[in-house]
């Protein structure tokens, strides 16, 4: 699924490494939290997994793709195996809930028949079947995040990457969101959650990879965050 072996990332002409010898493996079907203080390298790891960046050195494999020098023409195929959920939702204001989710299928060339079949299924899964005709401005923050999850999930990715998905949600909605991601994982999708939410991480017995200063400092199954909440 994801393999990083002694990965180093240096931006531009800077001497300090954003990542300095990162190694870990995320297997098919896992649910993993990636945690660490601000500036520790979490965002860089996401960009390397999605092909937005290439490593300075080391080896990375994602869903069978060798990310060291991956050809630009192969990036769309890689990214179809990934569903990314952003903290700021990134919904299209002029599109309804249904249209926002359907748009993710249209950009990869799905037929209208496929869209009509798949979109209602995903909206049902995330609990928004009765909101399909609403616009983003008519939804709560939690509902908007569920639309973002539906959009990330609609093309059947092998892996969901959630980048600070609870950043704009209250504690109750944050817990609901994590339970939804857990349900998606139980259905077979690998889930990687990048978060600062110590309470959420400690509440779920999942694997936690902790990084600091561009290095993995712990990797365990005890579900413990390991940092003071920021």
Specify the residue positions occupied by each region the protein language model found:
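A short, flexible loop at the N-terminus of ABC-type nucleotide-binding domains that lies
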Residues: 1, 10-21, 71
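Helix-to-loop junction immediately C-terminal to a conserved catalytic motif
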Residues: 50
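Conserved ABC transporter NBD signature motif
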Residues: 58-66
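Short coil-to-helix segment of the ABC ATPase nucleotide-binding domain corresponding to the Q-loop/switch region
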Residues: 95-103
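Conserved ABC ATPase signature
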Residues: 135-139, 143
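A short, proline-enriched helix->beta-strand linker immediately N-terminal to the Walker B motif
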Residues: 154-158
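Catalytic Walker B motif of ABC-type/P-loop ATPase nucleotide-binding domains
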Residues: 160-163
């Amino acid at each position: 699924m994801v393999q990083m072996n002694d990965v180093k990332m240096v931006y531009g002409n800077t001497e300090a490494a954003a990542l300095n010898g990162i190694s870990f493996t995320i297997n098919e079907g896992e649910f993993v939290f990636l945690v660490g203080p601000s500036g520790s390298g979490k965002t860089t790891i996401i960009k390397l997994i999605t092909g937005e960046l290439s490593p300075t050195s080391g080896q990375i494999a994602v869903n069978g793709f060798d990310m060291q020098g991956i050809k630009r023409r192969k990036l769309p195929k890689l990214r179809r195996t990934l569903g990314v959920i952003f903290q700021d939702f990134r919904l299209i204001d002029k599109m309804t809930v249904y249209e926002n989710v359907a748009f993710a299928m249209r950009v990869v060339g799905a037929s209208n028949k496929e869209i009509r079949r798949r979109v209602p299924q995903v909206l049902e899964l995330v609990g928004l079947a009765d909101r399909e005709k609403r616009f983003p401005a008519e939804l709560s923050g939690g509902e908007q995040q569920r639309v973002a999850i539906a959009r990330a999930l609609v093309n059947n990715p092998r892996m969901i990457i959630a980048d600070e998905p609870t950043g704009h949600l209250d504690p109750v909605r944050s817990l609901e969101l994590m339970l939804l991601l857990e349900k998606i994982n139980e259905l077979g999708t690998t889930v990687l959650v990048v978060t600062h939410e110590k309470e959420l991480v400690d509440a779920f017995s999942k694997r936690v990879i902790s990084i600091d200063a561009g290095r993995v400092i712990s990797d365990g199954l005890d579900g413990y965050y390991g940092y003071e909440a920021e």
